[in-house]
């Protein structure tokens, strides 16, 4: 009786211990360490941990609400797996362990959990593959210079040897790996990996679009926000040029392609007008002060009276008419108020001086503004400080004196080059050629066309687009810059609109994304058979169409808060 009671007490203690071990996530069999090691996929031999088996089963089961296991069921199933593993010859491998887990789940009628476990295992295999590939990529990016690593040289606009350039590549390469495994359909990812197609800017696949034509006239009116602060409407050509750079930079940070201005001359003309107006009245006050021996305060008061009576809308084009108004107004104003006599001829002389001085000062300010713009677009940072903005400017058709002055000085600044005389890479410049505007001798902007040719011969920019080409002329309406086809930095054009032909305009348009097809490979595979060639081409076109629509669906899900400048200010 004593021996039996002692045995029962010993048995109960052992069961209690086993229960406590199971509650802690362990098993009685694990404590006995009957399996000491496993062989990982890498071939490394590591210590065996039964808790990982239990954890994997638990995580798979939590995905299936209809097959939720109790703790006891989970422990029992883990024990069955361990028992089966003990019967295997030699040290079990990771693959063998996973096969046994699947087998035991199916035998216990946990089919859905088994399927979830298989998916869980597949995900981890992908992660392991991705980790191995990325670690190698990161190692090269971190420790090898660009001359030894192609990845660091694939984008000439990124200095991947710098800290920010390397950081940008970290994000780029990990994003591409993630999209390949979890976002892009497998057959499309494989086609890209094999070189049948090339998905451009794949690192931004689920994030943004390519490029945009920015209407600076619309943007600058009443000011705008970059997403980090609100900017007032510019009132000087220097401010116009500076904010043009900021607009390009802000949009570059929200898109993966280059940014273009389709109406640069029209937009800058407004800044030239404002600068001319300020310089005109400043020069007029200076002339009145000196010529008529007035105090600075009296000259300022008289200038204010002139502005109130005649308005401030004086431009290079209307300066002559304004001079005639001043000639009639000033003698009468002085006489009516009992002030110093100023004759009509003296008033006109004041206006002529103001116009001449304002033109000279505005021209100098415009050159400085364009010089600063060229330097800024080759030095200011975008995208985490790793690039300069990929910028393009379209111009050449604004025949106003102000627009012509802006283009003339941009060409002068481009000819002068950067600080050491080097040719500026940015902005890409496109001169829009149009008969009746600038193409033929006698056209109002013909001199600008000749200047552009001289500049291009020296500095490679501007390039030239021809608005009289049939595929461009069909959209053109005289005097409407929104109907003038403009080009992106990548030389693409977006103008047509098959959905609504009343909206075939330039401003605000852009590209969503690009994918290239490997035509030489198709030609080689066709072996001279045109029927086979077009059959293969049709297959690749269908695949690319599927891919572009897949990417478009992701892009359509984006919100304004994803693009505070592009959509918030557009």
Predicted features by range, described:
Residues 1-3, 20, 61-62, 273-277:
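Short regulatory "switch" loops immediately downstream of catalytic or recognition motifs
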Residues 14-21:
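Intrinsically disordered, low-complexity segments enriched in serine/proline and basic residues
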Residues 123-127, 133-570:
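Conserved catalytic cores of very large enzyme subunits
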Residues 2, 7-11:
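Intrinsic-disorder-associated, low-complexity terminal segments enriched in Asp/Asn/His/Tyr and depleted
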Residues 8, 30-144:
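Charged, amphipathic alpha-helical regulatory modules used
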């Amino acid at each position: 009786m004593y021996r039996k009671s002692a045995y029962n007490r010993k048995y109960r203690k052992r069961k209690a211990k086993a229960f406590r071990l199971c509650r802690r996530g362990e098993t009685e069999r694990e404590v006995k360490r009957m399996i000491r090691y496993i062989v990982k996929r890498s071939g490394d031999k590591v210590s065996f941990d039964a808790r990982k088996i239990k954890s994997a089963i638990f995580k798979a089961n939590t995905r299936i609400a209809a097959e939720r296991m109790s703790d006891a069921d989970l422990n029992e199933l883990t024990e069955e797996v361990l028992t089966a593993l003990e019967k295997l010859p030699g040290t079990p491998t990771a693959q063998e362990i996973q096969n046994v887990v699947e087998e035991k789940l199916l035998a216990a009628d946990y089919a859905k959990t088994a399927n979830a476990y298989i998916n869980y295992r597949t995900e981890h295999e992908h992660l392991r593959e991705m980790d191995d590939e990325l670690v190698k990529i990161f190692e090269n990016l971190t420790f090898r210079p660009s001359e030894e690593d192609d990845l660091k040289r694939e984008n000439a606009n990124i200095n991947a040897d710098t800290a920010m350039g390397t950081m940008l590549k970290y994000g780029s390469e990990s994003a591409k790996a993630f999209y390949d495994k979890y976002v892009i359909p497998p057959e499309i990812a494989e086609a890209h990996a094999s070189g049948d197609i090339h998905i451009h800017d794949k690192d931004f696949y689920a994030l943004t679009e390519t490029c945009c034509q920015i209407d600076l006239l619309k943007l600058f009116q009443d000011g705008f926000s970059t997403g980090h602060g609100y900017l007032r409407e510019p009132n000087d050509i220097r401010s116009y040029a500076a904010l043009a750079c900021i607009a390009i930079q802000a949009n570059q940070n929200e898109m993966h392609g280059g940014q273009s201005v389709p109406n640069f001359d029209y937009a800058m003309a407004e800044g030239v007008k404002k600068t001319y107006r300020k310089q005109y009245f400043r020069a007029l006050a200076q002339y009145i002060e000196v010529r008529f021996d007035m105090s600075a305060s009296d000259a300022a008061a008289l200038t204010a009276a002139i502005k109130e009576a005649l308005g401030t809308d004086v431009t290079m084009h209307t300066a002559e008419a304004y001079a005639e108004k001043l000639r009639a107004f000033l003698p009468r104003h002085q006489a009516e108020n009992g002030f110093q006599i100023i004759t009509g001829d003296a008033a006109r002389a004041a206006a002529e001086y103001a116009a001449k001085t304002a033109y000279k000062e505005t021209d100098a300010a415009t050159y400085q503004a364009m010089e600063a713009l060229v330097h800024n677009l080759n030095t200011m940072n975008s995208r985490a400080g790793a690039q300069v903005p990929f910028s393009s400017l379209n111009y050449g058709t604004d025949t106003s004196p102000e627009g012509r002055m802006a283009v003339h000085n941009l060409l002068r600044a481009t000819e002068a080059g950067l600080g050491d005389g080097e040719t500026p890479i940015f902005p890409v410049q496109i001169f829009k050629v149009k008969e009746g505007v600038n193409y033929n001798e006698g056209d109002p902007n013909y001199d600008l066309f000749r200047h552009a040719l001289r500049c291009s011969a020296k500095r490679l920019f501007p390039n030239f687009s021809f608005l009289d080409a049939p595929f461009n002329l069909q959209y053109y309406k005289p005097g409407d810059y929104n109907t003038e086809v403009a080009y992106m930095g990548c030389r693409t054009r977006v103008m047509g609109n098959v959905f609504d032909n009343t909206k075939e305009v330039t401003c605000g348009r852009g590209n969503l994304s690009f994918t290239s097809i490997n035509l030489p490979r198709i030609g080689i595979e066709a072996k001279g058979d045109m029927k086979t060639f077009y059959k293969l081409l049709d297959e690749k076109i269908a695949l690319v169409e599927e891919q572009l629509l897949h990417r478009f669906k992701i892009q359509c899900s984006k919100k304004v808060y994803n693009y505070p400048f592009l959509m918030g200010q557009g």
